[in-house]
Amino acid sequence: MSSFILKFLWLEKSVAVGLDQKIGDRTTPVTEFFFWPQHDAWEEMKNFLEDKSWIDQSEVVILLNQITEVINYWQEKTELQKRDISHLTEKFPNVVFVGFD
């Protein structure tokens, strides 16, 4: 079971990802939100994760793969499709979508 949760802001012009750590029944933010495509959110998260020796390498791979899947999915959608968010939690059950526009 992962001790981390990826949180996404699903926006029309960008998608952002932040990382929280599970502590008991609660979560606490570990990172700020990294935005795509204004910046390279994936690369920024990769650099952050690689600098943290307390995050297991296998966990890093899983988190980066999940980020890749969500960003790729976001990029494939038209602006109209990006507004239809009802299916996101089904498609990506291991992440949390915390904001939309």
UniProtKB/Swiss-Prot annotation:
It holds the Pfam family PSRP-3_Ycf65. InterPro entries: PSRP-3/Ycf65_sf, Ribosomal_PSRP3/Ycf65. The keyword Lipid metabolism does not apply. GO terms for cellular component: chloroplast; ribonucleoprotein complex; ribosome. Gene3D superfamilies: 3.30.390.140. GO terms for molecular function: structural constituent of ribosome. It is found in: Plastid, Chloroplast. Keywords: Chloroplast, Plastid, Ribonucleoprotein, Ribosomal protein. GO terms for biological process: translation. Probably a ribosomal protein or a ribosome-associated protein. Belongs to the chloroplast-specific ribosomal protein cS23 family. Part of the 30S ribosomal subunit. This is Small ribosomal subunit protein cS23.
